[in-house]
Amino acid sequence: MSNPLVYCLPDGYTMRPRDFAADPWQYQLVIHRGFDNDGTPEKWDDELLKRIPHANDALKTFAIANREYCAHCGLWYTTGDTAYVEPVATVPEHRKRGLAKAVVYEACSRAHALGAKRAIVLSDQAFYSRIGFTLSSEVYDWEHANSD
């Protein structure tokens, strides 16, 4: 993250400012719809969201159009060198416009300003390599085989 992360939002979209108080229902909808869920979700307990350890609302980025949250990047960072990107979602009708890249770049830039030197994502989706992430390590899931 040593080079500036540059993105361009399409006309009609804005990026959520750092001091913006996110609307919990809009936040829930962008996650629900961005992961291709149908229907209307059951409302989350807003108080529960406030108690998530290490949550930093200034690092939650949203691309917004007409007061609707269209794309989101969550990012976890406390101290040290590493920020963790998770989750990233774009509402289907707003895809293919560069919004996911924009929210990821904005979130990473905010973490960099706080001291993060790198950002990682635990995903091998091609999207992340297209926007500049490179493989730094691999994770293996080991399971014990039953001898039954």
Predicted regions and their residues:
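A conserved beta-strand-loop-helix scaffold within acyl/acetyltransferase catalytic domains
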Residues: D36-A89
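Short, hydrophobic beta-strand segments that form beta-sheet elements in well-ordered domains
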Residues: M1, A119-L122
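Hydrophobic alpha-helical core bundles mediating ligand binding, dimerization, or RNAP-core interactions
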Residues: Y27-H32
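Conserved active-site alpha-helix within GNAT-family acetyltransferase domains
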Residues: K101, S123-W142, S147
